[in-house]
């Protein structure tokens, strides 16, 4: 039997696509190779950080990263080798680190950040139950130079709240005297990504969306300019529309004769319990070492580190130890009780712009990947964009694709 819409990938982007397609009245089937219980979306920091925050590739990032490498505090770790794509990625990353590109990207972040926030509100109205707080993102600065640089960008719009080192401790009780101060970006929010994923899965299942868990897509059957069949290790599935949202895994993208400039960036998190009085009052980011610390219902999560050009899916204990060491330099001693360590791969483009839109060869294939560390931030917005695109029928008819897709960005 031919299915109307097949979404390949059960992460936040895939589920968001299924959610918005269902809202338009489509019959949707989600195919996910795992049991859907612990993918990369679950290990996310949970930041909805679209507002007044620069992308990874921004002016000064290259020099700052080199300085942090010397201190072993750099957020990016490159495993250099014979992979040509890595060097192409680095070159594009460096070229994107300019004021013009950053200004445009931040404007797009705001546009699609508000769309995501609206959709999170709708999900809650739909009866989903997940930890969601609109209480800002606290940017904590440990270098006077970067703190002063940030202060110059702050205006009196209400989107910023400048805090001294002493005032910062009211929001982050565990920081020590090695910090310079902080800026609360008031428009940002945070969620518990695991709760979002479970709530979204439950809602979609109850709404009649079909889920094929533990079923891996291994190939496609092509006929002329269409994908005639989706081949899993169990069966062949036909579909009118196929949405490919497989995150950092490039295997199926390559099956469609594409090779996007996107790297699987290995990220780490540690989730633990700590005394309530010591927990951060809102989501926080140690800006100079790119380490997020996010309060949740019963736990706290720290996330950091992005390793490029590695396929090793095991947790690197040295990286975990390095995260703890970097955090300890700016906090008072505290115990991470019942700590759970995690790592996973994020689909990272060099300029934080995702690959969205219809495939150039196959007319019933839509791509939705490349959000990197911003999956929770923009996943709901991407789902809405893709659903609208399916109605428009062509990339050029959809303004959001033209604005926010790497297919149309130099």
Curated annotation (Swiss-Prot):
Keyword terms, alphabetized: Cell inner membrane, Cell membrane, Electron transport, FAD, Flavoprotein, Membrane, Oxidoreductase, Transport
Cellular component, GO annotation: cytoplasm; plasma membrane
Protein name per the record: D-amino acid dehydrogenase
Family to which the UniProt record says this protein belongs: Belongs to the DadA oxidoreductase family.
Cofactor: FAD
Membrane topology classification: Peripheral membrane protein
Keyword NADP in record: no
Keyword field contains Transport: yes
Notes on temperature effects: Optimum temperature is 37 degrees Celsius.
Originating organism: Helicobacter pylori (Campylobacter pylori)
InterPro entries tied to this protein: FAD-dep_OxRdtase, FAD/NAD-bd_sf
pH-linked activity: Optimum pH is 8.
